Regions:
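Extreme N-terminal tail/first-helix region
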Residues: 1-14
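Hydrophobic alpha-helical core bundles mediating ligand binding, dimerization, or RNAP-core interactions
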Residues: 15, 19, 26, 92, ...
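Residues within well-ordered alpha-helical secondary structure of globular protein domains
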Residues: 28, 51-54, 94
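Short, contiguous alpha-helical
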Residues: 12-16, 23, 33-75, 117-168
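Short acidic-aromatic linear motifs embedded in glycine-rich loops, typified by GG[WY][YF]DAGD(H)
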Residues: 9-10, 69-87
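Surface-exposed helix-capping loop/turn segments at secondary-structure junctions
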Residues: 28-35, 102-112, 147-153
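Acidic/histidine-rich alpha-helical segments that form the ligand environment
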Residues: 80-115, 125-135
Length: 168
């Protein structure tokens, strides 16, 4: 395996892990709770999903995939309802599928090419790294807020022995 395939595989693995965790958190929260904000300066789970879709589309699908950037970032935070849990999850899954396809199909040239996103200069790899870490960061916020709203464990690793030591 060469470095580009390893980079792609590991990036997609992290995206899939975050998606799995978001699906678990979503299953615990009600339709009403999805749009509840902790306070006026914080985002609901619904807003975070819209924001993640916008960010991943901008950084991976548009930038790495060399498509037109049509993101309307402010709308991601201004929305207060109107989409159900099923609609939000469908939007997220479609975005993630497009992101994964874009990463899988990216050439070495695309991964190394410098580009401007939100006024920052990144290589294609930099765009993927940003999208993956940003997705993970907000996945943690979604998990925390779902646990706060429902007073339930999410059990991300139930049934797994996480005490196994690393081996070469």
């Amino acid at each position: 395996m060469n470095w580009t395939e390893d980079f792609k595989d590991n990036s997609i693995y992290r995206i899939d892990e975050s998606t799995r965790m978001i699906e678990i958190a979503f299953a615990k929260a009600s339709e009403t709770q999805i749009w509840k904000r902790p306070n006026k300066n914080s985002n609901s789970i619904g807003n975070l999903i819209l924001h993640l879709c916008g960010n991943m589309t901008q950084y991976v699908i548009a930038s790495l995939g060399e498509q037109e950037d049509k993101r309307k970032r402010d709308e991601e935070f201004e929305t207060t309802n109107g989409l159900s849990k099923a609609e939000l999850l469908s939007k997220l899954k479609k975005t993630v599928a497009n992101v994964k396809s874009t990463i899988e199909n990216a050439s070495e040239t695309q991964l190394l090419k410098k580009r401007s996103v939100q006024g920052f200069s990144f290589s294609g790899m930099g765009c993927v790294i940003h999208a993956v870490e940003h997705y993970s960061y907000h996945t943690g916020q979604i998990a925390f807020w779902a646990k706060q709203l429902t007073d339930q464990q999410l059990g991300f690793y139930d049934g797994m022995d996480l005490g196994i030591n690393n081996k070469d």
